[in-house]
From Swiss-Prot:
It comes from Pinus thunbergii (Japanese black pine). The gene is psbZ. The keyword Transmembrane applies. The chain crosses the membrane at residues 8-28, 41-61. GO terms for biological process: photosynthesis; photosystem II stabilization. Pfam families: Ycf9. Its main location: plastid. The lineage of its organism: Eukaryota, Viridiplantae, Streptophyta, Embryophyta, Tracheophyta. Coiled coil: none annotated. This is Photosystem II reaction center protein Z. PANTHER family: PHOTOSYSTEM II REACTION CENTER PROTEIN Z. May control the interaction of photosystem II (PSII) cores with the light-harvesting antenna, regulates electron flow through the 2 photosystem reaction centers. PSII is a light-driven water plastoquinone oxidoreductase, using light energy to abstract electrons from H(2)O, generating a proton gradient subsequently used for ATP formation.
Length: 62
């Protein structure tokens, strides 16, 4: 169970890093918000799901 928790935390960190880099780049592109809206919303949804998943796994570890 610990390895699953560590993997989930690593995935959360990786997704966070990608969003920190990717969202400003997507918004600064010439097409801006209109072309990258779906990608940003998908990334944020994945991040929220990862936070909830890590929280659930944390309740089993502690």
């Amino acid at each position: 169970m610990t390895i699953a928790f560590q993997s989930a935390v690593f995935a959360l960190i990786a997704i966070s890093f990608l969003l920190v880099i990717g969202v400003p780049v997507a918004l600064a592109s010439p097409d801006g918000w209109s072309s990258s809206k779906n990608v940003v919303f998908s990334g944020v949804s994945l991040w929220i799901g990862s936070v909830l998943f890590v929280g659930i796994l944390n309740s089993f570890i502690s």
